[in-house]
Amino acid sequence: MKTQVLVVLVLCVVFCLAESRNSMTSEERGLVSLMRQRDDIAKRLQCKCKGDAPDLSHMSGTIYFSCEGGDNSWKKCNSISVFADCCHKKPT
């Protein structure tokens, strides 16, 4: 009986520690969101399609591993690297 109680207690402690490591504060979530936005902007700056204006707000491209995947509404306009293409929306 003592062993069972000890096992349950240890499992509770382990579960509580795991949960505390996974929970983020609102400040941490905000920081993660800002980092993702910064990464998105950096990717957009790398992705320039022919005819795009030099400022970020007029760039039409976005980076994908393959422009032909998904809903087939994107067209390759540039290559960023061996693993990534710069794609923009196909005209409708």
Swiss-Prot record:
Family recorded in the similarity comment: Belongs to the sea anemone sodium channel inhibitory toxin family.
InterPro entries membership: Myo_ane_neurotoxin_sf
Tissue distribution of the protein: Expressed both outside and in acontia, a specialised envenomation structure laden with batteries of venom-containing nematocysts found only in the superfamily Metridioidea.
Organism: Calliactis polypus (Hermit crab anemone)
Propeptide positions: 21-42
Cell location: Secreted; Nematocyst
Main localization (coarse): secreted
Signal peptide limits: 1-20
Record function comment: In neuromuscular preparation of crustaceans, the toxin increased neurotransmitter release, causing repetitive firing of the axons. May affect sodium channels (Nav).
Gene3D superfamilies in alphabetical order: Anthopleurin-A (2.20.20.10)
Superkingdom: Eukaryota
Protein name per Swiss-Prot or TrEMBL: Calitoxin
Keyword vocabulary terms for this entry: Cleavage on pair of basic residues, Disulfide bond, Ion channel impairing toxin, Nematocyst, Neurotoxin, Secreted, Signal, Toxin, Voltage-gated sodium channel impairing toxin
Disulfide bonds: 47-86, 49-77, 67-87
